[in-house]
Amino acid sequence: DGYTRISESDMLLQPDPSTFQILPWRGDQGQSSRMFCDVLTPDGRPAPADPRHVLRRVLDRAADRGFTCFTHPEIEFYLLQSDQPGPDGEPVPVDRAGYFDNVPGSDAADFRRDAVSLLEGMGISVEFSHHENGPGQNEIDLRAADALTTADNVMTFRTVVKEVAAAQGTYATFMPKPFSEHPGSGMHTHISLFEGDSNAFYDPADEFRLSVTGRRFIAGLLRHSVEISAVTHQFVNSYKRLWGGGEAPSYVSWGHNNRSALVRVPLYLSLIHISE
């Protein structure tokens, strides 16, 4: 759904062998595997709206100009007691913990340990994991990888998180704003652009350590923020997250430490990158 008009709905799926992966859960039910597929039109051409094709096409254009793009996502989600609401009609989180809470033996700590172990076992490197601000809210950050690998890893990540939650008798949701009174969940994404071995965003002589390429990259993100939002914010609930604090972007602007800005540039000197 959403790829074409109804008169063009027949499509082909071409498995990408490089994404073959044995799924390590539910081993008592027999092993299963998965591969990501590229979407093709009936005549074998890449479907114009296939997300992997769209990303690959942009990365190829960047490569033709000598650039390589790396991304590093921080993925937030809530752990709930079940997929059913509580007596008051609200979802019920698994705990009432707060930011960076790490109580040994807690449901959230055990969950993160098991999820990270499973991800690492599948070849997906994890950089950090911790409890977030909301009750039952957690974050797991994946290590930087090329943009297409990251995109595939995020899709695998979502399945892993839901599988681990189900195995532990809980329910994981990536809903942007499941609670009106608690912070929403997002996926802050760090973007780095390299030209060979050099950070294309970094200029030590600039006031903000930003190169011309970095400034133009930010300008493009801000200029096309409305169009980008049509892809990244597909639901009414998505926009409920954007106002009311909670470190969610509220303004089409850029800055450094102001988390209400759409784009931030962390001041890590030569490690400067763009964070959305």
State where each predicted segment sits.
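Glycine-rich, acidic/polar active-site loops that bind/position phosphate-bearing ligands
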Residues: 1-271, 275
